C-alpha cells in the first residue's frame, strides 16, 4: 500500500500529466506539464540589487539598497523560485551567499518530495548562511507545491481568510518625512510599525498621531539600554495606542529584557534575540513572543516548526521579513493565518519587485490561490 507521501506525489503528478493542475490568480489559470529530463534537481542563481523606494533608517544604520540573490530550482520542466536577502546586520553578502550556493550539489537528488533529506543536507554544509539556505528552501517549497497543485497554506491546513493585517513600516526620519510617509499609508493599512530606539522616539510617535490614530507597533532594534527608562517609555507608548514592542534592548541584556517583559503592559517580541528553533528555549520567559524571519531561520520548513513550537510553549507568534521581493514575502505569508502579528511589507518598500504574489487589500494580507508560494515572475 502506498504511504501518504507517495500517494500525494502520485496524485499530484497524475493531475499534472492530465493538465488538471490549475489555480486562478492575477496571472490566470496555470498548468504545469512534466517534461522528461534527466530526473535531477537543477539550481541556478544570480545577484539582484533591491532598490528602496525611500531611504530606510533604523536605530543603527541607513540604506537605499539591499543586496539580494535570486534562486531557481528546476525539476522535469517545473521551476520553483526563491531568494536570499541580506540586510547589513545579518553579516552575509552576495559573495558569501553565492559562495555557499556554489557548494550545494542538488544534482544528487532525483525526488523533490524528499524535502527533509534535501534541506537537511543543505543545512549540514555550514553552521550559518541562513539567507542562502532560505533561498533554496523557498524555491524547493515552491516547486513541490506546484507539483502538488496546491499553495502551502492549504497543505498546512490553514484558512487564508484568517490571514492578519500586515504592519507597514515607518522608518526613523525627520518629522516632515515621517508625516509624509504616514499620509501615504493612511487608508491602506490597519496597523503601522514605527522604528524607534533613538532620542527622537516621542517626536516620531507624536508626529504620526497628528495624522492617524491607527494601532501602532514599535521596533526598537535593540536601541534602548536602560530597562527602567525603557519601561517608562513603554507605559507612555501604551497611552498613545501602541499594541506591541519588538526587541527593545540588546540581545546580550537578556535578564533586563526578562525584567522588562515581566513589568510591561504590552507584549514584548524577540527579533535579534532569536534566529532558529534551537534559540527558543534560551529566551523562554524573557519575551512574550517571537518574530520569525525566514532569512534567519533558513526558510519555510523551520519557520513553520518554530511557529508551532512557540504556540505549544504559550508564546505569541509574529512573522516578519527583510527588504525582499514578493517571492520571499509570499513564502512567509503562507503561514500568516497561524500568527498573531504579521510584518510582511518588505516587497512594498522596494521599487523593482520581480514577482506578482501576496497582496495587501484594505490593510489585510490576501494570499493568491496559486500553487507553491503563489508567485508569478513579472
What label would you give each PLM region?
Residues 6-26:
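N-terminal export signals
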Residues 32-45, 61, 74, 79-147:
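Metal- or metallocofactor-binding catalytic centers and their adjacent structured scaffolds
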Residues 152-264:
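Metal-dependent enolase-superfamily TIM-barrel catalytic cores that perform enediolate-based chemistry
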Residues 12-14, 35-50, 68, 76, ...:
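Flexible C-terminal active-site loop/helix
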Residues 71, 77, 136, 149, ...:
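Conserved, mostly hydrophobic/aromatic
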Residues 49-57:
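Short Pro/Gly-enriched beta-strand edge/turn motifs at strand-loop
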Residues 255-257, 263, 269, 273-344:
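Catalytic alpha/beta core domains of metabolic enzymes, predominantly
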Residues 1-3:
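N-terminal secretory signal peptides
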Amino acid at each position: 500500500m502506498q504511504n501518504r507521501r507517495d500517494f500525494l506525489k502520485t496524485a499530484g503528478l497524475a493531475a499534472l500529466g492530465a493538465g488538471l493542475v490549475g489555480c486562478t490568480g492575477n496571472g490566470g489559470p496555470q498548468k504545469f506539464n512534466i517534461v522528461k529530463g534527466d530526473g535531477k534537481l537543477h539550481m541556478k542563481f544570480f545577484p539582484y540589487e533591491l532598490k528602496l523606494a525611500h531611504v530606510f533608517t533604523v536605530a543603527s544604520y541607513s540604506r537605499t539598497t539591499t543586496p539580494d540573490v535570486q534562486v531557481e530550482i528546476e525539476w522535469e520542466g517545473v521551476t520553483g523560485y526563491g531568494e536570499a536577502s541580506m540586510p547589513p546586520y545579518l553579516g552575509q553578502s552576495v559573495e558569501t551567499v553565492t559562495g555557499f550556493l556554489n557548494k550545494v550539489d542538488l544534482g544528487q537528488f532525483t525526488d523533490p518530495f524528499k524535502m527533509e533529506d534535501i534541506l537537511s543536507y543543505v543545512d549540514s554544509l555550514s553552521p550559518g548562511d541562513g539567507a542562502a539556505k532560505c533561498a533554496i528552501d523557498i524555491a524547493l517549497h515552491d516547486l513541490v507545491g506546484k507539483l502538488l497543485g496546491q499553495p502551502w497554506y492549504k497543505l498546512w491546513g490553514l484558512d487564508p481568510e484568517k490571514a492578519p493585517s500586515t504592519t507597514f513600516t515607518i522608518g526613523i526620519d525627520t518629522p516632515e518625512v515621517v508625516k509624509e510617509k504616514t499620509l501615504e499609508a493612511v487608508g491602506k493599512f490597519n496597523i503601522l510599525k514605527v522604528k524607534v530606539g533613538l532620542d527622537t522616539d516621542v517626536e516620531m510617535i507624536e508626529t504620526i498621531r497628528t495624522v492617524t490614530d491607527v494601532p501602532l507597533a514599535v521596533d526598537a532594534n535593540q536601541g534602548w539600554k536602560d530597562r527602567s527608562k525603557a519601561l517608562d517609555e513603554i507605559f507612555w507608548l501604551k497611552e498613545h495606542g501602541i499594541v506591541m514592542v519588538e526587541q527593545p534592548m540588546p540581545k546580550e541584556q537578556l535578564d533586563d529584557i526578562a525584567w522588562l517583559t515581566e513589568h510591561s503592559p504590552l507584549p514584548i517580541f524577540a527579533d535579534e534575540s532569536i534566529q532558529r528553533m534551537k534559540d527558543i528555549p534560551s529566551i523562554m520567559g524573557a519575551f512574550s513572543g517571537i518574530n520569525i524571519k525566514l532569512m534567519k531561520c533558513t526558510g519555510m520548513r523551520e519557520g513553520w516548526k518554530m511557529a508551532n513550537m512557540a504556540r505549544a510553549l504559550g508564546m505569541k507568534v509574529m512573522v516578519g521579513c527583510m527588504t525582499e521581493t514578493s517571492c520571499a514575502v509570499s513564502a512567509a505569508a503562507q503561514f500568516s493565518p497561524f500568527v498573531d502579528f504579521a510584518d510582511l511589507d518588505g516587497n512594498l518598500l522596494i521599487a523593482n519587485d520581480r514577482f506578482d504574489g501576496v497582496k495587501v487589500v484594505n490593510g489585510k494580507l490576501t494570499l493568491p490561490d496559486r500553487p507553491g508560494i503563489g508567485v508569478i515572475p513579472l
